[in-house]
Amino acid sequence: MRSHYCGDVNKSHVGQEVTLVGWVNRSRDLGGVVFLDLRDREGLVQVVYDPDLPEVFAVASTLRAEFCVQVKGVVRARPDSQVNGQMKTGEIEVLGKALTIINAADPLPLSLDNYQNNSEEQRLKYRYLDLRRPEMAQRLMFRAKVTSAVRRFLDSNGFLDIETPILTKATPEGARDYLVPSRTYKGQFFALPQSPQLFKQLLMMSGFDRYYQIVKCFRDEDLRADRQPEFTQIDIETSFMTSEQVMAKTEEMMRGLFLEMLNVDLGEFPRMTYNEAMRRFGSDKPDLRNPLELVDIADLLKEVEFAVFSAPANDEEGRVAALRIPGGAALSRKQIDDYTKFVGIYGAKGLAWMKINDLNLGLEGIQSPVLKFLNESIVNEIVSRTGAQTGDIILFGADQATVVAESMGALRLKAGEDFSLLQGEWRPLWVVDFPMFEKINGNFHAVHHPFTAPRGVTAAELEANPANRVSDAYDMVLNGCELGGGSVRIHNQEMQSAVFRILGITDDEAKEKFGFLLEALRYGTPPHAGLAFGLDRIIMLMTGASSIRDVMAFPKTTTAACPLTNAPGFANPQQLAELGIAVVEKAVKTEG
């Protein structure tokens, strides 16, 4: 039906007859000549119909936006005065000789030109129309090229693309599972995989030493801009490779991807330990474009008569940190109050501040509601450590260390944006040496997942003292966004059983949920390691999209619904009966 894509016609085709198909982006009648902008996935081309062919001209005059048409005509160069440098095809146009309406279009339920006026609900309900917008089409085509490049790299490095099951068994991986009832085994359920983690480890045990898969994963969790109930991972696993080798290979892949797709050289990825990242930036995925850093000052404040500072300064689990903002002395009291409310979102009880109005005047040049609690030597040391200059402001976080990190880390990012401090376009790094466990309500939880190997300890040593142990785990971070994370895996049964016990998983529960893994670990399991990248997130970053919804063809809403298909929906009584399921209606409270 066509000889060329609309966006591919150029000056080399001048004088040639072409057959094009696509959608009418815009139609206008100017002085008896009809101009069409015809659109397909590759772009737009201008088609001109004049009255010399009355029948064809009459059809052209009836066209409206989004009619699907076939055009036949001759390519000609535009006069210099009419060249459109904003269009890829702006040097040429097609003189129409024939026109077929393949399918007419009703008036659209949303605007494709002024899409900002469309609600998110409208865009998702009529996604097949929203995807016709060039911006959306370009993102999906970019995504296809990225997956192709990833496959080429992994294929050329000896990785095998192997599929793993979608219907599997529920395992505790941090989020709720999507469950699928079994008709054959009444009362029993499959789970949709949160990741192929255990299957890819089993593939290593099977001798397939380099595996990859671009795979759908499912998590029933609260959604944010970078979360969806179903998402896509670039999943990788290797045998007989150390964490350093895995990082080197996947860094090579990511650097090559950015060079091929964006002509960006990411350079070498620096390494930073988890503890350093949390200390300096209050985050395990720091945005290094932002020059602001947290500075510890608790040692200066243990004796001050101001409990807001001295209490956390004397608490082993407390922290007092200072954040200098260049030029921040210009902040109004209302703006400081807004920052105080902002850190309150993250659990902070307040936000002390110190304005450096004139450093040459000593204490006289410093303004702060807490100045009366601090002697001159303490103030001077705070100024020295933070590097504060005249015109700056120093903001203080004082609380439990976790609260300070989260609240001041978030404030660091906000202030960096507010004061336009970000430097450079791309700043990657590896974050390494994560804690093996974290304590929540007195119980140990895996920081990554229960199959992550500790670094440099035996099973007995780990179980005897699990606190403060370091895992052999690594995250790739770019511009404050975690692109992917992985680890060396546990490859012996003794260590895996010890980790389960530390996590409060009884031997019986471990046997019921992970018996197949524990048994597999008895039969010559090789050392193995891997990681998974979030493909949607990578595409979002590379294209500058504001949400992963804008780089997925048919995403869900933030309430995990699909307005297009009205999913999820109710099952009919016969289906429920076959599955042995009864739906319990939610009780409704009545007055009186």
Swiss-Prot record:
Q: Where does ATP bind?
A: R219, D220, E221, Q228, E482, G534, L535, D536, R537
**Binding of L-aspartate, residues:** E173, R219, H448, R489
Please give the residue ranges the record annotates as the region Aspartate: 197-200
Q: Which GO terms describe its cellular component?
A: cytoplasm
Name the Pfam families for this protein: GAD, tRNA-synt_2, tRNA_anti-codon
Q: Which UniProt keywords apply?
A: Aminoacyl-tRNA synthetase, ATP-binding, Cytoplasm, Ligase, Nucleotide-binding, Protein biosynthesis
Matches recorded under Gene3D superfamilies: Bira Bifunctional Protein, Domain 2, GAD-like domain, Nucleic acid-binding proteins
What is the superkingdom listed in this entry's lineage?
Answer: Bacteria
**Which GO biological process annotations does it have?**
aspartyl-tRNA aminoacylation
- Enzymatic reactions: tRNA(Asp) + L-aspartate + ATP = L-aspartyl-tRNA(Asp) + AMP + diphosphate
Major subcellular site: cytoplasm
Cross-referenced SUPFAM superfamilies, in alphabetical order? Class II aaRS and biotin synthetases, GAD domain-like, Nucleic acid-binding proteins
Question: Does the keyword section mention Translocase?
Answer: no
Determine if Nucleotide-binding is one of this entry's keywords.
Answer: yes
Q: How does it assemble?
A: Homodimer.
* Reported function: Catalyzes the attachment of L-aspartate to tRNA(Asp) in a two-step reaction: L-aspartate is first activated by ATP to form Asp-AMP and then transferred to the acceptor end of tRNA(Asp).
PANTHER family, per the entry: ASPARTATE--TRNA LIGASE, MITOCHONDRIAL (PTHR22594:SF5), ASPARTYL/LYSYL-TRNA SYNTHETASE (PTHR22594)
Similarity-based family: Belongs to the class-II aminoacyl-tRNA synthetase family. Type 1 subfamily.
What name appears for this protein in its UniProt entry? Answer: Aspartate--tRNA ligase
Gene name on record?
aspS
